[in-house]
Amino acid sequence: MSRRTALVMAGGTGGHIFPGLAVAEALRAEGWQVHWLGAPAPSMEHELVPARGFAFESVAFSGVRGKGWQTLAWLPLKLLRAFAQSVAVLRRVRPQVVVGLGGYISLPAGLMAVLLNKPLVLHEQNSVAGMANRVLARVADRVFTAFPQVLRGAEWVGNPLRRAFLQQPTPAERYAGRSGPLRLLVVGGSLGAQALNTLVPQALALLAPEERPLVTHQSGAKQIDALRAAYAQAGVDATLTPFIDDTAQAFAQADLVITRAGASTVTELTAVGVPAVYVPFPHAVDDHQTHNARFVVEAGGGWLMPQYSLSAEALAAHLRGLDRTTLLAHAERAWGLRQIHATAAVVAACDTLASGTTS
């Protein structure tokens, strides 16, 4: 029996790429040969994926939302080129299954996969489906979502996660031995979150020294110097870092996280069982980060504080009112939302669909 081949399509942001990598690594562990379809350099996927040992294919196609009428005018020609490039990739790779995890790059290749009778599996990470997945869901063989009631007929399985997030102790086990100041983790993401980098030091400065938590603040590489200056000006001690190497462990060690509300972050926090103050990125497409956060907040797993109305005074007052008993209760409610079988569900769908194909 020849080795099975899968083509994984994902690109644009880490919210698509990292779940795609979780699926790709699981497929490879089961003996699949995995190729990745993304945008050419200097894309994020081109930087991350080949370094993990996956064959990389590229199609030149970019998003059009919010780009103006000139970009829309060229869309038909760009689509035709992307269709032709996608067909060439599909004929060269000859996958038994094509797996799409969102991002504009998956649209032309997904449509051509269906045209060439390739089984198509989709996974949507956000609580509001992106344009590519909204289109492809109508013709895909299997559709999975990270949140409930996102796409009609889809199966709610959560987001694909790296194993480390599933191996942490329960909230009750973690909180049991803790004492002293609360442990606060502020996560700005790979690019940083300037609003958090500015607001959090100001809020902490409004707390008396004995009220302040132990702070670890991740800023993003480009903002670390400005963050150091902000904490120095506020007179607040904190551990500042541009990146977090082991996010799962960092989440598990925190009593509380302040963060944006990207789909992967929300899923990882519920998988570990950590309460969070969510400050959604206000310019996200379709305001999907607010919808992501509400899913957890309405279940009691955290708090939603929109950026447009958030002040240092309001954040300081919120922090002042928290204790470990309250945080443990919210952590357990977040834990109750965890979905840990998403990767296995996607891989199982690939196995089933591949059994009915020969090339």
Language model segments and positions:
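Conserved nucleotide-sugar phosphate-binding/catalytic loop shared by glycosyltransferases and other
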Residues: 3-10, 28-81, 221-223, 306-308
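Active-site-proximal region of nucleotide-activated glycan assembly enzymes
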Residues: 33, 41, 55, 114-171
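Donor-nucleotide binding loops and adjacent catalytic segments primarily
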Residues: 37, 42-48, 170-257, 290-294, ...
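Acidic donor-binding loop of glycosyltransferase active sites
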Residues: 95-97, 252-267, 274-275
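Conserved donor-binding/catalytic loop of nucleotide-activated donor transferases
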Residues: 116, 252-254, 270-279, 299
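A short, well-ordered alpha-helix in the C-terminal region of glycosyltransferases
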Residues: 326-340
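C-terminal alpha-helical cap of glycosyltransferases
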Residues: 340-359
